[in-house]
């Protein structure tokens, strides 16, 4: 039996939605409706130190003002940490996760000694210092071994998405994005063993999103292009955990006046929902859809008909 389409929008309550996040929300909602599927909302508050109290309610109100209503009650990652611990425990038992004692300075020093002192999108490529043990130091975090997956055949996908082309060959992960086309990444070389649980006890986005997508039966992930770089890590985690890989569609970014990506970190203005149709029309144009007049409901219906991603 073919799985029903299930999509999701997963905002972090570190600030209100802005114009860029509405693009991802609208695209994921339209994709679900165009496929006669379900659209879920998940509040990604696993990074608790960065979350702002009450911001989850603000985000849900912004979505509602724009006519974007979930088909099930929202879920909060902060209430699901037991699931993430179970997944981490499974990886530890399999020898795929290990404790790490390294600070950022330790990693920079190790990379410098190797002549590889380089950062990728601000991230340091972890050199595997603690793979062989802590050597008397105290573990600060848990990392995933990225160099052990050798399968060279099509990967398991959700039944709905069997046409997706996914492959892991010689540690290089290949996948097809519905908008960006063929993609690949050598995770061990370009990312290194990445963190699953931080020194402060918080689980990372990579582990939480993989566990939640599987638990909620997500068939299609529609999100901003700034998150495309995470896809290979998530596919690797899915396969390590024996979870299906959904299809991925990464939407265009909204850029600021100087060409920078709009984000909460660089002070993007909160989404103004006093005129929701104006906000939605701006998001629709980014997605290549025509502007609509009239009601919000009428515009959403027209865009569902026009959606062909």
Swiss-Prot record:
Keyword terms of this UniProt record: Aminoacyl-tRNA synthetase, ATP-binding, Ligase, Metal-binding, Nucleotide-binding, Zinc
Cofactor: Zn(2+)
Disulfide bonding pattern of the chain: none
GO CC terms of this entry: cytosol
InterPro entries per the UniProt record, alphabetical: Glu-Q_tRNA(Asp)_Synthase, Glu/Gln-tRNA-synth, Glu/Gln-tRNA-synth_Ib_cat-dom, GluQ/Sye, Rossmann-like_a/b/a_fold
Enzyme Commission number(s) from the entry: 6.1.1.-
Cofactor binding, note field: Binds 1 zinc ion per subunit.
Domain of life the protein comes from: Bacteria
Keyword Aminoacyl-tRNA synthetase appears in the UniProt entry: yes
Entry keyword annotation includes rRNA-binding: no
GO molecular function, one term: glutamate-tRNA ligase activity
Binding annotation for ATP: 264
Described purpose of this protein according to its UniProt entry: Catalyzes the tRNA-independent activation of glutamate in presence of ATP and the subsequent transfer of glutamate onto a tRNA(Asp). Glutamate is transferred on the 2-amino-5-(4,5-dihydroxy-2-cyclopenten-1-yl) moiety of the queuosine in the wobble position of the QUC anticodon.
Family statement: Belongs to the class-I aminoacyl-tRNA synthetase family. GluQ subfamily.
Official protein name in the record: Glutamyl-Q tRNA(Asp) synthetase
Protein source organism: Albidiferax ferrireducens (strain ATCC BAA-621 / DSM 15236 / T118)
Species classification: Bacteria, Pseudomonadati, Pseudomonadota, Betaproteobacteria, Burkholderiales
Gene name of this polypeptide: gluQ
